[in-house]
Curated annotation (Swiss-Prot):
InterPro entries: DabA (IPR018752)
UniProt subcellular location: Cell membrane
Protein name, per record: Probable inorganic carbon transporter subunit DabA
Binding positions for Zn(2+) per the UniProt entry: 399, 401, 581, 596
Membrane topology: Peripheral membrane protein
GO molecular function: zinc ion binding
């Protein structure tokens, strides 16, 4: 007769094994491989959405969920309360849950009557917790004790915990917490970007060398701890190797051990990883970080060494397994005790497999399938014919950002306007340098690197006047910051600035909209930028890492590529407007998170203006005309910026307009107040602040943007759920509720499938990262979010912490995803990508793009298509 141990270990643990084969590697390779468990974390000023599991996509979503539950006790499936709330709102169709359960049962092997199993599963899927009275009952615990031999064999665990996590000092403090305290301190010192006027000594030599010089003087360490590090190696790699050796970590366990340390502070480790990817000087920074961390761990735990078992043993808990059959399977304790060992083994093995993760996985999939079905019905009921379209009066290209969807919908209803969706950097791989700035900012998705630098230029005299005004403004800020950071002047600063800042506090608090508008207009007047041009022509400057401007071929190529990507190669309107987007908020560390994700946390207006300027160049139009893309003479390209917080369109580039273009411009201007009113009303009514009809939506939106006490100026990209790639006619009359990324695509102009592949590789990846950033911050806010905005501390100019000694918080704040303390606003669904194209196009894409195919197969994104006849297919 097969024992219960063999049933559980052979049949069940196969599902749980998420380990990856680890071959012997040198230390550089080990650290690089271990870095898969964290994601790069951008500084908050250039906040870029990232999904925290980007290095783990070779494993399935389910495997990563199981592994994180074992490794860090982190749940990445929606909680029971989220699921119950979604079901109550009609967001989950019960039939999808039942079909999902049937498929799962069909895939399992068990020797229990199907009806009995289904009854157990149906009860368990109610997601009720087992009663504590049952779990603690003496009778149940006695039954479990009779089967205690099961616990002699622990579960296989692919995660090696840091040695410090198993040890407590005499005060009862876990040594891993003490280690984290030290590491946070050293990370803040080294990474500090603007927080102090005194920098870390020897910082230019790298983190490890700087730490090595100072650690012997650290008063926070005991004399014995400092003595361990007294003659410690000066080379980070040697030190890391030695520390691992003295801790007794075997060669086969090294990568798992390094992963455990990276996951201990994923925020600081993520920032270190990001820095290591930015320059060759810091490319070994992650090794240095681990060398510092594990060297300090050795110093702290050495008095306690050796410890017998460094692996986290997660023994099989028999009590809840028996309790689950008693509570959900209607089996009495008497009946259980009368069962044979084989019957008990079968029931326990099944209960172990049908664990909480599986139950919540089935609910998540039902939630996602319900959303897909609802989207399918919206699209199929609203499709319009694409033939014989009249020439639109104006065409406006917006970013794919979900916040563009309501604005576009209301705009199209109010006039003969056609809108397009395109990535907000408009296909221009540029670093932008605004007028008078010595620095440049990559203005493209963070997954790409800039290939050109574009500088803003103006008349020399105008430039001098502008610089003088700007210098006055910057000198005030610089003086304030210097006084604030200096030991002596910081004592005087409150006396000097108190009256002015006190007045600002009062006025900002009680009349935020008026004061904010006044200050904004005052600043705009003082720093009025003169008319500018761009350095569009190619210049080879040896001082710059990337060339300035474009060659003629590059100008034509970028314009052609963007126009073809959205299918705009004919029937041009008299006015074509490229609309970047930006946000507007006050006293908001996360301001960059509300900007354009396609522009690396910056506004998209600069790119829009550059692209529109390129489209108006005669040389570009002539070259495009020779290729069959004929832009009429009366068609003028302009640029604007969609202000998402107030839903307004701000014009930033209006060249001389033709008569028909002027008519189009006037028409847009005439409807814009109504568009703003409708879009603002729709958006504001979703905020928890409003329960009744809003009298003046635009006025309220401006108050939200200017109020420095407002913790939620807008929802950002919350509730994003789908990325629709196709012609606008597919979704034109659909109310997509601001939940869909929209990218125009015409498969008839993409014979090779290359355009579709580019959309998936670029905007598709950006949308997926944004989606999973919101997902992670919702389902595991304590680990992947950043807590409550009101208690955050901006630290080192890099990011936020809770208090002064927490991890650098990697995700979105509570206010970005939660409606209230108990109710989420964001629906944690994995991104559904819908492509309007024949089936063969999707097959070609999946066959040629291994990375995307892996994402789909492993459950990181969902994929559906709509063929030319309107038939929907799930892939």
């Amino acid at each position: 007769m097969m024992s219960i141990q063999s049933i559980i270990t052979k049949e069940t643990l196969k599902k749980k094994d998420t380990n990856i084969e680890i071959q012997e590697k040198n230390m550089n390779d080990l650290v690089e491989s271990a870095s898969r468990v964290i994601a790069p974390l951008w500084p908050i000023a250039t906040f870029a959405a990232h999904h925290p599991w980007m290095g783990l996509e070779k494993q399935s979503f389910e495997q990563v969920a199981d592994w994180l539950k074992e490794a860090r006790n982190v749940d990445i499936y929606p909680s029971a309360s989220m699921i119950h709330s979604a079901k109550a709102k009609g967001e989950i169709e019960e039939s999808f849950l039942q079909s999902g359960l049937s498929r799962w049962l069909d895939s399992q092997s068990f020797h229990i009557p199907r009806k009995k199993v289904e009854q157990f599963c149906q009860a368990a899927l109610k997601l009720e917790e087992l009663p504590s009275s049952l779990l603690s009952s003496p009778q149940l615990n006695k039954l479990a004790e009779e089967m205690s031999y099961i616990n002699t064999e622990s579960m296989k665990d692919s995660f090696l915990q840091p040695v410090s996590s198993f040890i407590e000092n005499q005060k009862g403090e876990n040594l891993s917490d003490i280690l984290n305290y030290h590491i946070i301190k050293w990370c803040k010192l080294y990474l500090d970007d603007s927080g102090s006027s005194w920098t870390m000594p020897n910082r230019e030599q790298g983190l490890y060398r700087a730490w090595h010089h100072l650690i012997k003087f650290d008063p926070a360490l005991s004399k014995n701890e400092r003595s361990v590090l007294k003659d410690w190696p000066e080379d980070a790699e040697i030190a890391l190797t030695r520390a691992l050796s003295e801790l007794g970590i075997s060669e086969s366990n090294k990568q798992a051990y390094l992963e455990g340390h990276l996951l201990a502070l994923p925020g600081w480790a993520g920032m270190i990883l990001w820095r290591s990817q930015q320059s060759t000087q810091e490319q070994e920074l992650l090794i240095q970080y681990l060398a510092v961390r594990i060297s300090m761990e050795l110093a702290i735990v050495k008095p306690y060494l050796p410890i017998k078992n460094q692996k986290a043993e997660k023994k099989i808990a028999i009590v809840p397994l028996i309790a689950s059959w008693i509570y959900w399977g209607n089996i009495s304790t008497l009946k259980w005790s009368q069962m044979s060992a084989a019957e008990q083994s079968e029931l326990l093995a099944f209960a172990y497999r049908f664990d909480e993760n599986i139950r919540r996985k089935l609910w998540l999939e039902a939630w996602e399938q319900t959303h897909a079905e609802q989207l399918k019905k919206k699209i199929s009921s609203k499709q319009r014919a694409t033939n014989d379209k009249k020439r639109a009066l104006a065409q406006l290209a917006f970013c794919i950002d979900v916040r563009s969807e309501p604005f576009r919908r209301h705009l199209e209803k109010l006039g003969p306007f056609e809108t397009f969706g395109i990535a907000g950097f408009f296909g221009l791989p540029i670093a932008t340098s605004e007028l008078g700035s010595s620095d440049s900012h990559p203005s493209l998705p963070v997954i790409l690197k800039p290939k050109h630098q574009i500088k803003e230029l103006t008349d020399e005299n105008e430039f001098k006047n502008y610089q003088q005004r700007k210098k006055i403004d910057s000198s005030v800020s610089y003086t304030f910051k210097t006084m604030k950071q200096n030991v002596l002047t910081s004592m005087l600063l409150p006396e000097v600035s108190g009256p002015l800042l006190g007045l600002q506090m009062v006025t900002r608090s009680f009349v935020p909209r008026r004061v904010g508008s006044f200050l904004r207009n005052l600043r705009k007047t003082m720093l009025q930028k003169p008319d500018t041009t761009f350095s569009l022509n190619h210049v080879h400057d040896t001082k710059c890492e990337i060339p300035i401007g474009f060659t003629k071929e590059e100008k034509v190529n970028y314009v052609r590529q963007a126009l073809k990507m959205v299918g705009l190669t004919e029937k041009f309107a008299p006015l074509v407007v490229m609309c970047g987007h930006s946000s507007q908020s006050t006293n908001n560390p996360y301001a960059a998170a509300l900007e354009c994700g396609a522009c690396g946390g910056a506004a998209g207006g600069f790119n829009a203006k550059v692209f529109a300027t390129l489209c108006n160049l005669p040389e570009v139009r002539e070259a495009l005309s020779a290729e069959g893309i004929k832009i009429p003479e009366d068609t003028i390209f302009a640029a604007a910026e969609h202000k998402t917080t107030v839903d307004e369109l701000e014009w930033i580039y209006i060249p001389e307009l033709s008569e028909t273009a002027q008519e189009a411009f006037d028409s847009i201007e005439s409807v814009m107040p109504n568009v703003s009113q409708h879009a603002n009303r729709e958006r504001l009514m979703q905020l928890p602040n409003f329960k009744t009809e809003i009298k003046n939506p635009s006025k309220e939106a401006h108050r939200f943007a200017e109020d420095w006490s407002e913790i939620r100026p807008e929802w950002g990209l919350a509730r994003n759920a789908s990325f629709i790639i196709g012609q606008r006619e597919l979704t034109q009359d659909c109310d997509l509720e601001g939940r869909a990324f929209l990218h125009n695509y015409d498969w008839k102009q993409d014979g090779s499938g290359d355009i579709l592949a580019s959309i998936i590789a670029g905007p598709g990846t950006v949308a997926q990262w944004i989606n999973l950033q919101y997902y992670a911050s919702t389902v595991a806010p304590h680990y992947y979010g950043s807590g409550n905005k009101t208690t955050q501390t901006v630290t080192a100019g890099l990011g936020v912490m809770q208090g002064n000694a927490s991890d650098l918080l990697p995700g979105l704040p509570w206010q970005s995803v939660m409606q209230s303390d108990r109710e989420t606003y964001h629906s944690p669904l994995r991104l559904l990508i819908v492509i309007q194209a024949p089936t063969k196009y999707i097959e070609h894409l999946l066959n040629n793009d291994f990375t995307f195919r892996e994402k789909v197969q492993n459950g990181w994104v969902r994929l559906a298509s709509v063929d030319p006849e309107g038939r929907w297919k799930n892939w």
